[in-house]
Amino acid sequence: MRFTISTSELKSLYLEKRDDLLVIDARPYSDYALGHLPNAVNIDLVQFHWIDTSKEGISQFNKQMKIILSNIGVTKNKFVVFYDSISGMFSARGVWLLIYFSHSKTAMLDGGFNKWKKERLKIETKSNQFIHSYFRGKPNPKVLADFGYIKSKIKKKSNNNVLILDSRSKSEYEGSVIRAAKAGHIPSATNVDWSCNINKNGAFKENTELEKLYSHIPKEKEIITYCHGGYRAANTFVVLRNLGFKNVRMYVGSWGEWGNKIDLPVER
């Protein structure tokens, strides 16, 4: 299943006037107000990061996210398209969130608003109101990793079935850039900067290029992506799923949690 949609494909959905289409602008409201896709509602997803993956933390995450998804009008019948300026981390976070809640009818706009605007497709400036719903999506624990799960996996040094993938910059991975109490990376993690997923024009690279980028990662393994706040890692999550990786989790707490927990191990 592919979790991206092209500008031409989305344009066709608009022309069909489908009432099951929900388009969500994941950029800051200041950007949305200057121009956005037709009928799009705005939710600044960067405001909803989560760095507590304790049992209680995940319980609260589930409750809060279901409220948000209900407020913006997600129902089981909706095909939900997220976009930001490019094929970025915020729209990817939205897609991951819906997949986590067992809603597979979702995609992110490849190339984002910038590509849509460059192609001179329809844009509007009026703010669109949410149509509230009651979202009933069921969390899928196989799509999310918490710190306890990762800790249990790296403790078993003989466990070769799991690969931890760090989507941050090389400097964050190596520890020369410090954004938490501790610097470095989760032990045994390999690093592929999420920005390598995207062309200079802001759209995703072709699958042939992405296959080459991730050729060192076996598809039969369980992959756990992480970054600092669970956004860049969401972009990598979407890429891997598009490439046919079936067993992919995202560590939603990421380094913002791991790097600030004194009892968790790190490597530099």
Residues of each region from the PLM?
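Cytosolic catalytic domains that perform sulfur/thiol-centered chemistry
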Residues: 1-268
